[in-house]
């Protein structure tokens, strides 16, 4: 799996301190939006047209936030397990996906198929697009491919900037953007440009990997995710923060490029553009 190996090797260099880092955030609402905006720049013409039609002009980035908004709706409570998959450190992801209730890999396959099915109608396919965009981002967050015993880091208590939190939220929560004090901060367009630049020239390589491999990459990052020590106040040290945040930037870039690849496979092949 050359893509996964190269990704893990790059992360190893970052953690060892051989690569400069800058602060950013993980997959809160704005993180999902950025994945969608990065994807939009890699769409073929037909895919861009279909996305605009299905979303009635709403941006792919904003539409991808919808699956988090509807999780408490009784109609969509069933979607909660679709955001993640539990697997042991040495477990085979292919052996645990597709179980009753679903998981993030199962969901990506399900909504890819629904999006491609013209007979389902616009509303159903628009929902499928929103789910697909969201879950492609989720599977790139290392703790969405997590350990069952600590609920993907949710049971590991930490403190960030003086506030009680947990390991999962450090990698996933919107407020991590506050850590970006050295560059773009809350400048949405600046963040999108910075994340997009990380994937420049990598589309063909990144899109050659399948969904299982995306999840294996997240699983392979687990040693880096759990390699932390806490200060007396329960906070991470600066080296861990910097390395973790740079990993998040790389995963956001990969997620956006791969989401575009999925949409191009669905729409552009049908239109003879690939």
Segments (PLM) and residue ranges:
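Positively charged n-region of N-terminal signal peptides that target proteins for export
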Residues: 1-7
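Bacterial N-terminal signal peptides
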Residues: 9-20
């Amino acid at each position: 799996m050359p893509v996964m190996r190269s990704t893990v090797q790059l992360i190893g260099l970052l953690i060892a301190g051989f690569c400069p880092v800058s602060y950013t955030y993980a997959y809160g609402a704005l993180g999902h939006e950025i994945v969608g905006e990065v994807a939009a720049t890699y769409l073929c013409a037909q895919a861009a047209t279909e996305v605009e039609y299905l979303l009635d002009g709403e941006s792919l980035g904003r539409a991808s936030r919808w699956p988090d908004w509807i999780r408490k709706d009784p109609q969509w409570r069933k979607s909660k397990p679709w955001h993640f998959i539990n697997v042991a450190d040495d477990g085979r992801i292919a052996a645990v996906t597709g179980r009753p209730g679903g998981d993030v890999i199962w969901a990506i396959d399900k909504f890819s198929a629904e999006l491609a099915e013209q007979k389902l109608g616009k509303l159903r396919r628009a929902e499928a697009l929103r789910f697909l965009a969201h879950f492609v981002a989720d599977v790139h967050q290392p703790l969405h491919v997590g350990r069952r015993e600590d609920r993907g880091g949710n049971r590991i208590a930490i403190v960030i900037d003086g506030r009680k939190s947990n390991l999962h939220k450090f990698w996933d929560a919107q407020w991590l953007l506050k850590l970006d004090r050295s560059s773009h901060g809350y400048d949405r367009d600046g963040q999108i440009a910075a994340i997009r630049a990380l994937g420049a020239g990598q589309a063909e390589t990144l899109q050659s990997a399948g969904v299982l491999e995306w999840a294996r990459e997240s699983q392979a990052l687990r040693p880096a995710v759990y390699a932390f020590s806490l200060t007396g106040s329960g906070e991470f040290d600066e080296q861990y923060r910097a390395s973790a945040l740079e990993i998040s930037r790389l995963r956001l870039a990969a997620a956006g490029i791969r989401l575009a690849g999925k949409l191009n496979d669905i729409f552009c092949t049908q239109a003879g553009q690939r």
